[in-house]
Amino acid sequence: MEIKYLDHFNIKASKGQLSEVRDFYIDVLGFKVGFRPKLSGPGQWLYAGSNAMVHLSEDENRTSRKAEDFLDHIAMRCVGVNEFAKKLDEYSIQFRPAYIPEIDLTQLFFKDPAGVTIELNFKGEKLSE
């Protein structure tokens, strides 16, 4: 028995919040809206390639819930650290870079509009100064 990789994560929020969250994941991180089967409530699935990685679910009772109370962060393996850093700057998104020399890993940390911390990991890449 083994876990292979992160399958998906779900963000539940009000309709208005979900619109902002959806746009963030599409515009800033490059996800695409894709197929979502008929489920009990409204929502969307966002894809990275052929993987439905971000599930968005509408729940009008979630207007004041703080994501950081339950979810610390979401990490994704990526390529193109400098391109991502430039895009975050273009959107005026503050981020904290980190580098772990023992495993040659550069990381970018920032928050999405729902308050969820996003960690982007870049193996073998360094952030330009």
What are these model-predicted stretches?
Residues 33-65, 117-124:
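Conserved short beta-strand elements that form part of the metal-binding/catalytic scaffold
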Residues 1-4, 90-129:
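Vicinal oxygen chelate
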Residues 1-22, 72-74, 126-129:
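N-terminal beta-strand motif that seeds the catalytic metal site of vicinal oxygen chelate
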Residues 40, 70, 104:
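Exposed loop/turn and edge beta-strand positions of beta-sandwich/beta-sheet ligand-binding modules
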Residues 67-88:
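Mid-chain, well-packed structural core segment of small domains
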Residues 26-33, 93-94:
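Conserved acetyl-CoA-binding loop of GNAT-fold acetyltransferases
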Residues 21-26, 88, 115:
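Conserved active-site tyrosine of GNAT-family acetyltransferases
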